[in-house]
């Protein structure tokens, strides 16, 4: 991925940067692998706003991504690498020997023409999928399952990866993208390699309108509102919030309040918290 930087001819192009999409090999998606999804725009089923910072944005077709690599033992070939407006990673179109086609998350260094396979004893090669208990220690993986058979849920964003640290008994120790060290069941599946589009974090939007294209609305601070709109609002000039601790618009503690339950069943699987990194 190559990033193109704009010259500061206007305030909208100053510090603006975009990807040049050099890795994209096909512009139009497979028609039968896409469908339209009605976007909630931050509202619930009654039309009431439940998330004030979502809404608008360009229309999108959702691509069916194969997070659960269940075509066991069937060789697949990479036909194209495509842009997906629903995620920051690229997607790869795979053609299988049985005639099926599907999309997968595009790993870094997977090229058009490469072959991939999903099996219990797949070779350790980028794009191949197998149980994490069969993967050597230190290997970088992505699209990792939390629960066996549920499909990949961990490390699906651009540039993310998981690393295997230990393999003992019923569990495998991994390092999460956040730095958290935790245990996973040995029967969970994963895909070899790191998610592509590594430089996505270096892209600068440059103007507010570009954020609106993505469906994000402005986030207004509570202290900038009136007292009828937020507990932090009101006052003369630049005044403090007038409370011992910050709260949400509905008066509940915010900014530092712990939200994870100390009795959560999965706490026993966390060896080192991400906050200790």
From Swiss-Prot:
The keyword Ribosomal protein is assigned to this record: yes
Biased composition (Basic residues): 255-277
A Pfam family of this chain: Ribosomal_L2
Domain of life: Eukaryota
GO molecular function, one term: transferase activity
Record carries keyword Ribonucleoprotein: yes
Any one Gene Ontology BP term: mitochondrial translation
Organism for this UniProt entry: Euglena gracilis
Protein's name according to its UniProt entry: Large ribosomal subunit protein uL2c
InterPro entries on file: NA-bd_OB-fold, Rib_uL2_dom2, Ribosomal_uL2, Ribosomal_uL2_bac/org-type, Ribosomal_uL2_C, Ribosomal_uL2_CS, Ribosomal_uL2_dom3, Ribosomal_uL2_RNA-bd_dom
PANTHER family membership: LARGE RIBOSOMAL SUBUNIT PROTEIN UL2M, RIBOSOMAL PROTEIN L2
Subcellular location: Plastid, Chloroplast
Subunit-level organization: Part of the 50S ribosomal subunit.
Disordered: annotated segments: 225-277
């Amino acid at each position: 991925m190559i990033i193109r930087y704009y010259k500061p001819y206007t305030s909208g192009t100053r510090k603006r940067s975009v990807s040049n999409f050099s890795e994209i090999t096909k512009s139009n998606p497979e028609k039968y692998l896409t469908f339209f999804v009605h976007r909630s725009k931050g509202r619930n089923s009654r039309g009431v706003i439940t998330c004030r910072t979502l809404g608008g944005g360009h229309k999108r077709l959702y691509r069916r991504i194969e997070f659960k690599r269940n075509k066991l033992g069937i060789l697949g070939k990479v036909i194209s690498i495509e842009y997906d407006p629903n995620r920051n990673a690229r997607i790869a179109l795979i053609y299988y020997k049985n005639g099926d086609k599907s999309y997968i998350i595009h790993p870094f260094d997977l090229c058009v023409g490469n072959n991939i396979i999903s099996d219990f004893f797949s070779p350790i090669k980028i794009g191949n999928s197998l149980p994490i208990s069969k993967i050597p220690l230190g290997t970088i993986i992505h699209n990792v399952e939390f629960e066996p058979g549920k499909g990949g849920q961990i490390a699906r964003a651009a540039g993310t990866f998981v690393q295997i640290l230990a393999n003992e008994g019923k569990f495998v120790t991994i390092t999460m993208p956040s730095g958290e060290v935790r245990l996973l069941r040995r029967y969970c599946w994963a895909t070899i390699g790191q998610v592509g589009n590594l430089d996505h974090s270096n892209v600068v939007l440059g103007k507010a309108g570009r954020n609106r294209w993505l469906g994000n609305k402005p986030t207004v601070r509570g202290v900038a509102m009136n007292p009828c709109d937020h507990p932090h609002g009101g006052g003369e000039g630049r005044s403090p919030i007038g409370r011992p601790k910050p709260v949400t618009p509905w008066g509940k503690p915010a900014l530092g309040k712990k939200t994870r339950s100390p009795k959560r069943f999965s706490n026993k699987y966390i060896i080192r918290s991400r906050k200790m990194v």
